[in-house]
A protein has these predicted regions:
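Bulky hydrophobic segments
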Residues: 2-109, 115, 119-136
Length: 136
C-alpha cells in the first residue's frame, strides 16, 4: 500500500516523521538545544518571533507545522481522526514530561500553545476541505 501512494503524500509523510522525531529530541533533551546553538547556553530559550507571549509562540509554530504535516499525510484515510488524537495526546505528554526532565519546566502557557497550534491546523485543514468540495 505504501508504494502505491501518491509520491507527494509520501514526501509529506517522510517530512512528518522526520519532524516528529526532531520535535521529540528537542522536547526531551534536558535543556534547550536551540538555545545552545544560538547563544551557547542550554538554559536560554530563543524567541523565534519576538512577541508578548515569550517562547510559547515557538510551541504554537512547532505544533501547527507538525499538525499540518500529520493531517495532510492522513487526510484521505480513516487515520485522520487517529492522527488528530495522536497529536493532542503527544502535545500533552511532551509538556507533562517537563515535570521530570532536568533543566525543563512545565508551563500551562506552553501546553495551551501546543494545543493552539494543533487547533489552528485543524481549522485550516477543515476550511481547505470545505473549499475544495465547493462548500465555501
Amino acid at each position: 500500500r505504501f508504494f502505491k501512494m501518491d509520491y507527494k503524500i509520501r514526501i509529506v509523510r517522510y517530512l512528518y516523521f522526520f519532524s516528529f522525531v526532531s520535535l521529540l529530541i528537542l522536547y526531551l533533551f534536558p535543556g534547550s538545544l536551540i538555545g545552545y546553538l544560538f547563544y551557547g547556553d542550554f538554559s536560554r530559550q530563543p524567541d523565534i518571533i519576538p512577541n508578548p507571549l515569550g517562547t510559547s509562540i515557538n510551541h504554537t509554530i512547532a505544533f501547527f507545522y507538525l499538525s499540518i504535516l500529520g493531517l495532510i499525510s492522513y487526510m484521505r484515510g480513516t487515520s485522520f481522526k487517529q492522527t488528530l488524537i495522536f497529536l493532542v495526546v503527544v502535545s500533552l505528554i511532551l509538556e507533562l514530561s517537563h515535570l521530570i526532565i532536568p533543566n525543563r519546566s512545565f508551563q500551562y502557557s506552553d501546553l495551551f500553545a501546543n494545543l493552539l497550534g494543533t487547533l489552528l491546523a485543524i481549522v485550516i485543514i477543515f476550511l481547505y476541505k470545505r473549499l475544495k468540495n465547493g462548500k465555501i
